[in-house]
UniProtKB/Swiss-Prot annotation:
InterPro entries: DTB_synth_BioD, P-loop_NTPase
An annotated GO BP: biotin biosynthetic process
Enzyme class, broadest EC rank: ligase
EC number: 6.3.3.3
Required cofactor names: Mg(2+)
Pathway listed: Cofactor biosynthesis; biotin biosynthesis; biotin from 7,8-diaminononanoate: step 1/2
Amino acids binding Mg(2+): T17, D50, E115
Protein name: ATP-dependent dethiobiotin synthetase BioD 2
Annotated binding of ATP, by residue: D13, I14, G15, K16, T17, I18, D50, E115, G116, A117, G118
Superkingdom of source: Bacteria
Catalytic residue positions: K38
Subcellular location: Cytoplasm
Gene name of the encoded protein: bioD2
Subunit details: Homodimer.
Protein backbone atom coordinates (compact mmCIF):
# COMPACT_ATOMS: atom_id res chain seq x y z
CA UNK A 1 0.00 0.00 0.00
CA UNK A 2 1.33 3.41 -0.96
CA UNK A 3 2.37 6.14 1.43
CA UNK A 4 0.18 9.22 0.96
CA UNK A 5 1.53 12.69 1.67
CA UNK A 6 -0.80 15.68 1.59
CA UNK A 7 0.76 18.86 0.18
CA UNK A 8 -0.68 22.14 1.37
CA UNK A 9 0.59 25.69 1.64
CA UNK A 10 0.52 28.60 4.04
CA UNK A 11 -1.31 30.69 1.44
CA UNK A 12 -2.61 30.73 -2.11
CA UNK A 13 0.11 30.88 -4.81
CA UNK A 14 2.84 29.87 -2.37
CA UNK A 15 4.28 27.24 -4.73
CA UNK A 16 2.42 24.05 -3.79
CA UNK A 17 2.26 22.82 -7.37
CA UNK A 18 5.96 23.35 -8.06
CA UNK A 19 6.83 21.79 -4.70
CA UNK A 20 4.63 18.76 -5.40
CA UNK A 21 6.37 18.11 -8.72
CA UNK A 22 9.78 18.73 -7.16
CA UNK A 23 9.19 16.35 -4.27
CA UNK A 24 7.79 13.70 -6.62
CA UNK A 25 10.93 13.89 -8.76
CA UNK A 26 13.09 13.67 -5.65
CA UNK A 27 11.36 10.46 -4.57
CA UNK A 28 11.59 9.07 -8.11
CA UNK A 29 15.35 9.68 -8.10
CA UNK A 30 15.50 7.48 -4.99
CA UNK A 31 13.96 4.63 -6.99
CA UNK A 32 10.33 4.91 -5.86
CA UNK A 33 7.27 4.84 -8.08
CA UNK A 34 5.42 8.11 -7.50
CA UNK A 35 2.18 9.66 -8.68
CA UNK A 36 0.78 13.07 -7.88
CA UNK A 37 -2.89 13.76 -7.40
CA UNK A 38 -4.74 17.06 -7.37
CA UNK A 39 -7.69 17.01 -4.99
CA UNK A 40 -9.63 19.69 -6.90
CA UNK A 41 -8.58 22.07 -9.70
CA UNK A 42 -10.28 25.35 -10.45
CA UNK A 43 -9.63 27.83 -13.23
CA UNK A 44 -9.17 25.44 -16.15
CA UNK A 45 -10.82 22.81 -18.35
CA UNK A 46 -9.84 19.30 -19.32
CA UNK A 47 -6.75 17.86 -17.66
CA UNK A 48 -5.81 19.85 -14.57
CA UNK A 49 -3.13 22.46 -15.24
CA UNK A 50 -1.32 21.58 -12.02
CA UNK A 51 -0.92 17.99 -13.17
CA UNK A 52 0.69 19.22 -16.39
CA UNK A 53 3.16 21.17 -14.26
CA UNK A 54 3.86 18.14 -12.06
CA UNK A 55 4.59 15.94 -15.07
CA UNK A 56 6.86 18.55 -16.65
CA UNK A 57 8.93 18.82 -13.48
CA UNK A 58 9.00 15.04 -13.09
CA UNK A 59 10.12 14.71 -16.70
CA UNK A 60 7.38 12.23 -17.63
CA UNK A 61 4.41 12.10 -19.98
CA UNK A 62 0.81 12.24 -18.84
CA UNK A 63 -0.22 8.95 -17.25
CA UNK A 64 -3.27 6.85 -18.02
CA UNK A 65 -4.64 7.92 -14.65
CA UNK A 66 -4.31 11.55 -15.74
CA UNK A 67 -6.25 10.87 -18.92
CA UNK A 68 -8.95 8.98 -17.03
CA UNK A 69 -9.45 11.76 -14.48
CA UNK A 70 -8.28 9.65 -11.56
CA UNK A 71 -5.46 12.00 -10.60
CA UNK A 72 -7.86 14.96 -10.50
CA UNK A 73 -11.50 13.94 -10.07
CA UNK A 74 -12.84 17.50 -10.03
CA UNK A 75 -11.96 20.25 -12.53
CA UNK A 76 -13.89 23.53 -12.61
CA UNK A 77 -13.74 26.44 -15.02
CA UNK A 78 -13.95 29.46 -12.70
CA UNK A 79 -10.75 30.41 -10.79
CA UNK A 80 -12.04 30.58 -7.22
CA UNK A 81 -12.53 28.56 -4.06
CA UNK A 82 -13.63 24.97 -4.84
CA UNK A 83 -16.98 25.28 -3.08
CA UNK A 84 -17.87 28.37 -5.15
CA UNK A 85 -16.57 26.89 -8.41
CA UNK A 86 -18.76 23.83 -7.85
CA UNK A 87 -21.76 25.98 -6.98
CA UNK A 88 -21.38 28.02 -10.18
CA UNK A 89 -21.51 24.80 -12.22
CA UNK A 90 -24.31 23.34 -10.09
CA UNK A 91 -22.14 20.41 -9.11
CA UNK A 92 -21.29 18.85 -5.75
CA UNK A 93 -17.82 17.88 -4.57
CA UNK A 94 -18.09 14.54 -2.81
CA UNK A 95 -15.38 13.38 -0.45
CA UNK A 96 -15.96 9.73 -1.37
CA UNK A 97 -15.01 10.29 -5.01
CA UNK A 98 -11.66 11.81 -4.04
CA UNK A 99 -11.04 8.97 -1.58
CA UNK A 100 -11.81 6.35 -4.23
CA UNK A 101 -9.34 7.91 -6.67
CA UNK A 102 -6.60 8.03 -4.03
CA UNK A 103 -7.23 4.37 -3.17
CA UNK A 104 -6.88 3.36 -6.84
CA UNK A 105 -3.55 5.17 -7.08
CA UNK A 106 -2.33 3.57 -3.86
CA UNK A 107 -2.75 0.14 -5.45
CA UNK A 108 -0.19 0.93 -8.15
CA UNK A 109 2.40 3.34 -6.72
CA UNK A 110 4.79 3.52 -3.77
CA UNK A 111 3.91 7.15 -3.05
CA UNK A 112 0.87 9.32 -3.74
CA UNK A 113 1.41 13.07 -3.32
CA UNK A 114 -2.04 14.59 -2.89
CA UNK A 115 -2.04 18.35 -3.51
CA UNK A 116 -4.83 20.38 -1.97
CA UNK A 117 -6.46 23.51 -3.36
CA UNK A 118 -5.45 26.71 -1.59
CA UNK A 119 -4.66 26.68 2.12
CA UNK A 120 -5.73 24.53 5.03
CA UNK A 121 -9.10 26.13 5.71
CA UNK A 122 -10.34 26.45 2.14
CA UNK A 123 -13.88 25.00 1.87
CA UNK A 124 -14.35 22.32 -0.76
CA UNK A 125 -18.10 22.10 -0.25
CA UNK A 126 -20.69 23.89 1.89
CA UNK A 127 -19.84 21.82 4.96
CA UNK A 128 -16.18 20.79 4.87
CA UNK A 129 -12.74 22.34 4.52
CA UNK A 130 -9.39 20.92 3.50
CA UNK A 131 -8.50 20.69 7.18
CA UNK A 132 -11.59 18.57 7.83
CA UNK A 133 -10.49 16.21 5.05
CA UNK A 134 -7.03 15.96 6.59
CA UNK A 135 -8.43 15.24 10.04
CA UNK A 136 -10.57 12.44 8.62
CA UNK A 137 -7.61 10.76 6.91
CA UNK A 138 -4.64 11.77 9.07
CA UNK A 139 -2.33 11.97 6.06
CA UNK A 140 1.11 13.31 7.00
CA UNK A 141 1.43 16.84 5.66
CA UNK A 142 4.08 18.55 3.58
CA UNK A 143 3.68 22.28 4.21
CA UNK A 144 4.97 24.73 1.60
CA UNK A 145 6.19 28.15 2.72
CA UNK A 146 8.47 30.91 1.39
CA UNK A 147 10.57 33.87 2.44
CA UNK A 148 8.15 36.65 1.62
CA UNK A 149 7.03 39.06 4.33
CA UNK A 150 4.37 37.46 6.52
CA UNK A 151 5.48 33.88 5.96
CA UNK A 152 6.68 33.34 9.52
CA UNK A 153 3.26 34.23 10.91
CA UNK A 154 1.37 32.14 8.35
CA UNK A 155 3.69 29.15 8.78
CA UNK A 156 3.46 29.09 12.57
CA UNK A 157 -0.33 29.43 12.44
CA UNK A 158 -0.52 26.50 10.01
CA UNK A 159 1.79 24.35 12.12
CA UNK A 160 -0.12 25.13 15.29
CA UNK A 161 -3.53 24.33 13.83
CA UNK A 162 -2.21 21.04 12.44
CA UNK A 163 -0.71 20.20 15.82
CA UNK A 164 -3.99 21.04 17.56
CA UNK A 165 -5.76 18.56 15.26
CA UNK A 166 -3.03 15.95 15.81
CA UNK A 167 -2.10 15.90 12.13
CA UNK A 168 1.58 15.09 11.67
CA UNK A 169 3.81 17.32 9.55
CA UNK A 170 6.31 15.25 7.60
CA UNK A 171 8.17 18.21 6.11
CA UNK A 172 8.21 21.94 5.57
CA UNK A 173 9.36 22.90 2.08
CA UNK A 174 10.91 26.34 1.86
CA UNK A 175 10.32 27.86 -1.57
CA UNK A 176 13.08 30.28 -2.61
CA UNK A 177 10.77 31.85 -5.19
CA UNK A 178 9.90 34.68 -5.44
CA UNK A 179 13.31 36.19 -4.88
CA UNK A 180 12.28 39.10 -2.70
CA UNK A 181 14.06 40.98 0.10
CA UNK A 182 17.06 38.78 0.90
CA UNK A 183 17.37 40.09 4.46
CA UNK A 184 13.79 39.02 5.22
CA UNK A 185 14.08 35.79 3.22
CA UNK A 186 17.26 34.61 4.94
CA UNK A 187 15.95 35.42 8.42
CA UNK A 188 12.66 33.68 7.65
CA UNK A 189 14.51 30.53 6.61
CA UNK A 190 16.75 30.59 9.70
CA UNK A 191 13.84 31.29 12.06
CA UNK A 192 11.68 28.47 10.69
CA UNK A 193 14.57 26.01 10.77
CA UNK A 194 15.28 26.86 14.43
CA UNK A 195 11.56 26.69 15.29
CA UNK A 196 11.22 23.18 13.87
CA UNK A 197 14.38 21.98 15.58
CA UNK A 198 12.95 23.13 18.91
CA UNK A 199 9.24 22.37 18.64
CA UNK A 200 8.95 19.72 15.91
CA UNK A 201 12.29 17.91 15.62
CA UNK A 202 10.83 15.05 13.57
CA UNK A 203 9.68 17.43 10.84
CA UNK A 204 12.08 17.76 7.90
CA UNK A 205 13.04 21.20 6.61
CA UNK A 206 13.68 21.13 2.86
CA UNK A 207 14.87 24.05 0.75
CA UNK A 208 13.45 23.77 -2.76
CA UNK A 209 15.65 24.72 -5.69
CA UNK A 210 14.58 27.56 -7.95
CA UNK A 211 12.71 25.84 -10.78
CA UNK A 212 11.84 27.30 -14.16
CA UNK A 213 8.66 25.78 -15.60
Amino acid sequence: MAKVFFITGIDTDIGKTIATGWYAKKLMQQGASVITQKMIQTGCRGIAEDLLTHRKIQGIELTEEDKQGITCPYVFDYPCSPHLAAKLEQRTIERKKIETCTALLCEKYDYVLLEGAGGLCVPYNEEETTLDYLCQHQYPVILVTSGKLGSINHTLLSLQVLNSKRVSVHAVIYNLYPETDQVISQETQHFLRRYLEKYSPNTLFEVMDLISV
